[in-house]
Regions:
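Conserved N-terminal/central alpha/beta ligand/cofactor-binding core
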Residues: 6, 24-131, 142, 154-174, ...
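Internal hydrophobic alpha-helix adjacent to the cofactor/substrate pocket in enzyme cavities
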Residues: 379-400
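Extended, charge-enriched "interface" segments that sit outside catalytic cores
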Residues: 431, 437, 448-453, 457-611, ...
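An anion/pyrophosphate-binding glycine-rich loop and adjacent beta-alpha core
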Residues: 39, 57, 185-321, 418-491, ...
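Beta1/beta-strand and adjacent pyrophosphate-binding region of the FAD-binding site
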Residues: 4-18
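A glycine-rich dinucleotide-binding beta-alpha-beta segment and adjacent secondary-structure elements
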Residues: 307-373, 401-414, 533-587, 592
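Core beta-strand elements of the Rossmann-like FAD/NAD(P) dinucleotide-binding domain
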Residues: 141-150
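Glycine-/small-residue-rich beta->alpha transition segments that form the dinucleotide
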Residues: 150, 155-159, 315, 328
Length: 626
């Protein structure tokens, strides 16, 4: 028998990476929040790679931290190995990545949710949802009925989940958990635009059966940069990763058994991730390649499980064993968990606003893989924004909408709600037009003032941030006013780095503009240098060295924002606008962009269509001014 379980401000369905950030943000902003999960023991689970960060994903984690989210802190507290990727390239693409103790990370996040004021964490499966009299009504499997002002759907791969391993398939969530089958039916009945996507995960092997002496070890960085700008946790490297490669025998085994793959036999209907293909997909698509790189990574400090990055598969279990045993170092490996593919329901993100609220469902928000994205970091970023905006809607405040020039978070959301996605969306640095401005090292300078204004950044943390800004400006002035004097030692170093020697004296800032010079190189010749934190000098050096490029990108941002401020009425009838092409009418009517800048980024909307739209808006503005 159904019973009334009470009223809440914000209900979050799912306690994965999106649900955690949504629940914490909502509660920290003062809303009575309830987070529902199918299993309390799997809060913040990592069903695939036990890592946080990576190229562009590390940018997202630092942005989450800069806004006041939790992922960066949780990762720092549970890191096994930390590396900064792409150090051989420019600072725009430097990206932190950490190997994580997945069980410890989960326990950290569960404890954080349990201890958060205004938040209740509950093990319960939501099986029905509908809108009634200005509230969302949620019913659990045990017939408890909750009423919520706003709901965040953060269902991950649980929604209608089905696992595939060769000829075997069955209803399941990730890691053998129950799927959310009834909720999927309820959302379809509600009218949400659901579709099927697919993802997969590799096998896990017992470390004791891996011949590590045959593998190439990979160590963490000596100079560690944590995810969190707070520096709350001391991050240490305690485990190694390893590298190996597939070979010709691996390829033969997979190709001879391709007919047994559900991916190639037509059993899987869902669309898989373009940038994270299975090993059988890689063998077929890149047939000319002789080998594929495999990373063997620890899953935790208290387990022998090792994760095989690059070997995602849905081939039968016996075939998996056969091809694993062809790989150097894995010839005698024991599989602890079999690789699988999982198909699940998600939405078309074109149904969402930039606030991540549905266009047609008041107070209903989506986040994470439910929105068609892939990855823990993409999920957490969306969860943070959805949680913030659900809370702000309850409090009758305007939504937080980050634009493309503010953050990778803004780029991610804009891509999803403006362009949509035909396969699981993955963040990449190449997706941003402004990546020199959106570096991982300056995420706090871009976003911490916003987090403070929202109420997610403490006064103590904000004061420390403001002090950092003061030091950056002080050092810039010093660099402009400090003269570095010529000497044989300095000129020998400059010549060895293939840059011209100096005569007499030169300003420190002028030397720093040279690609071959940096603060570390110039330390012996800069006796007045103050004892500031290294991140202060890092920011000053980048600002000086890339000043011209930064100014050019900022001019592009100013032009983009000129169009972003031109709002489009949501009740506009595009079909009534003379001059718009039919494709533009269809796309604009479906997506309903909130401003001209967003409209200009829609595939199928031309510059000529934007001109027609601008003329119409200007005409309407003149009418209102009279």
């Amino acid at each position: 028998m159904k019973y009334d379980a009470g009223r809440i401000d914000v209900a979050v369905i799912g306690a994965g990476h999106a649900g955690i950030e949504a629940g914490l943000a909502s509660a920290r902003l003062g809303c009575k929040t309830e987070v529902f999960t199918i299993n309390l023991d799997w809060v913040g689970n990592m069903p695939c790679n036990p890592s946080i960060g990576g190229t562009s994903k590390g940018h997202l984690v630092r942005e989450i931290d800069a806004l006041g989210g939790e992922m960066g802190l949780a990762a720092d507290a549970n890191t096994l190995q930390m590396r900064m990727l792409n150090l051989g390239k420019g600072p725009a693409v430097h990206s932190p990545r950490a190997q994580i103790d997945r069980r410890a990370y989960s326990a950290y996040m569960k404890r954080t949710l349990e201890e958060q004021e205004n938040l209740t964490l509950r093990q319960a499966e939501i099986v029905d949802i509908y809108y009634d009299s200005g509230e969302w009504v949620l019913t659990t499997r045990l017939e408890a009925v909750y009423r919520a002002k706003c709901v965040v759907l953060a269902t991950g791969t649980f929604l209608g989940g089905r696992v595939y391993i060769g000829d075997v398939s069955y209803e399941s969530g990730p890691d053998g958990m129950f799927p959310a089958t009834e909720l999927s039916k309820s959302l379809k009945a509600l009218g949400l635009p659901l579709r099927r996507f697919k993802t997969g995960t590799p096998a896990r092997v017992n470390r004791r059966s891996v011949e590590t002496e045959k593998l190439e070890p990979q160590f963490g960085d000596e100079d560690i940069v944590p995810f969190s700008f707070t520096g709350r946790y001391e991050v240490k490297n305690t485990r190694e990763c390893y590298v190996t490669y597939t070979g010709e025998e691996t390829k033969k085994v997979i190709l001879s058994n391709l007919h047994r793959s559900p991916l190639y036999s037509g059993k899987i209907d869902g669309v898989g991730p373009r940038y994270c293909p299975s090993i059988e997909d890689k063998i077929v698509r890149f047939s000319e390649k002789e080998r594929h790189q495999i990373f063997i990574e620890p899953c935790g400090a208290e387990t022998q499980e090792m994760y095989l990055q690059g070997l995602s598969s849905s081939l039968p279990e016996d075939v998996q064993l056969e091809f694993l045993h062809t790989i150097p170092g894995l010839e005698h490996c024991e599989v602890m968990r079999t690789a699988y593919a999982i198909e699940y329901d998600c939405i078309d993100p074109l149904a969402l606003k930039r606030s991540l609220e549905f266009n047609d469902f008041d107070g209903l928000f989506g986040a994470g893989q439910f929105n068609g994205s892939s990855g823990y970091e993409e999920a957490a970023a969306q969860g943070l924004i959805a949680g913030i905006n659900a809370a702000r809607k309850v409090q009758k405040k305007s939504a937080l909408e980050l634009d493309r020039a503010s953050s990778y978070i803004g780029t991610l959301i804009d891509d999803l709600v403006t362009k949509g996605c035909s396969d699981p969306y993955r963040m990449m640095t190449s997706r941003s037009e402004y990546r020199l401005l959106l570096r991982q090292d300056n995420a706090d300078r871009r976003l911490t003032p916003i987090g403070y204004e929202l109420g997610l950044i403490s006064q103590e943390r904000y004061d420390a941030f403001c002090r950092k800004l003061e030091l950056i400006e002080d050092e810039k002035r010093r660099a402009e006013n400090t003269t570095i004097h010529a000497c044989k030692e300095l000129n020998d170093i400059l010549v060895s780095r293939e840059t011209s020697p100096i005569d007499g004296g030169i300003r420190l800032s002028e030397l720093l503009r040279r690609p071959q010079a940096d603060y570390k190189l110039l330390a012996p010749f800069d006796p007045t240098r103050p004892d500031y934190p290294k991140e202060v000098f890092e920011q000053v050096e980048i600002d000086i060295k890339y000043e011209g490029y930064i100014k050019r990108q900022q001019a592009q941002v100013d032009e983009m924002r000129r169009l972003e401020v031109k709002k489009i009425p949501q009740d506009i009838d595009y079909a009534a606008l003379g001059g718009l092409r039919l494709e533009a009418v269809e796309k604009l009517s479906k997506i309903r962009p909130e401003n001209v800048g967003q409209a200009s980024r829609i595939s199928g909307v031309s510059p000529a269509d934007i001109s027609v739209l601008l003329i119409h808006l200007e005409r309407e503005n003149r009418k209102h001014d009279k």
